[in-house]
Curated annotation (Swiss-Prot):
It comes from Rattus norvegicus (Rat). Residues 1-32, 90-107, 169-202, 277-282 are extracellular. Belongs to the G-protein coupled receptor 1 family. Glycans are attached at N19. Keywords: Cell membrane, Disulfide bond, G-protein coupled receptor, Glycoprotein, Membrane, Receptor, Transducer, Transmembrane, Transmembrane helix. Pfam families: 7tm_1. In addition to the well known disulfide bond common to G-protein coupled receptor 1 family, trace amine-associated receptors (TAARs) contain an unique disulfide bond (Cys-22-Cys-186) connecting the N-terminus to the extracellular Loop 2 (ECL2), which is required for agonist-induced receptor activation. This is Trace amine-associated receptor 6. Residues 54-68, 129-147, 224-259, 303-345 are cytoplasmic. One of its GO terms (cellular component) is plasma membrane. SUPFAM superfamilies: Family A G protein-coupled receptor-like (SSF81321).
Amino acid sequence: MGSNSSPPAVLQLCYENVNGSCVKTPYSPGPRVLLYAVFGFGAVLAVFGNLLVMISILHFKQLHSPTNFLIASLACADFWVGVSVMPFSMVRSIESCWYFGRSFCTFHTCCDVAFCYSSLFHLSFISIDRYIAVTDPLVYPTKFTVSVSGICISISWILPLAYSGAVFYTGVYADGLEEVSDAVNCVGGCQVVVNQNWVLIDFLSFLIPTLVMIILYGNIFLVARQQAKKIETVGNKAESSSESYKARVARRERKAAKTLGITVVAFMISWLPYSIDSLVDAFMGFITPAYIYEICVWCAYYNSAMNPLIYALFYPWFKKAIKVIMSGQVFKNSSATMNLFSEQI
């Protein structure tokens, strides 16, 4: 009498014939191709979109401003996420294996954390910049100079790189979790297990700047509403050239603040699920299913691809700069001094 039971599934390993290899749990062909397309598109957009932002701001002299230099540096951080983090995380997420070695796993994790915090620092300084620009637009050029912007950029790179290097190359993040760490660190894996103390520090490092940005942008839009009422009042009277100039400057700064406010909101929405998930896992015993964790991770990664899309939607100068770059006009000697703004202020 024949048996109806199916043969047992063959256990797949990341490295066949290697002791201590991680178990491989690959997707079926259809979802696998779809995931490579979705994740790959995000990586390509993060690389080339942010490269366009950097080229635009650094090439066109009209865009050389303290705020735009901060935006270019933010784009640089997102660019490196697309180059050094997303492609390798894509393979790990889809193949459920890490094929790039233990040393590169540590380097990859450092880059992941450093560029995330670099983005957060940049957005915090941009929020301060916009707050000063909107609340005191005429004094702003003397307060937030290119030199000040350079200091902010330096801080936004040096502190995150030093922090991530110190934490992940010393191994302090796993103190007290040696047994758990040994259990998940099989050959072909790149899972970082972080103890409660460091997860709490990371969460507060995300939460505190986020709350500061929310407060700053809340004040920005309150001031913007007051300015709009004043401009409407002035518009109903015979306005002097000085009042007209103030109104145009205020209008420009409000528009810039709105666009960058959207960028901040996008960052918060992208990173909040991952931050909460990390906190829950650390204090609840790593209970999050793998697929939920991957969704949270890739929501965070996709933030690096979103900023160029936001700029393209809300910044006419960026659209024009893209056309000039893609058409090859950027190689003309006169392109650096080209006017990218349709209206004068």
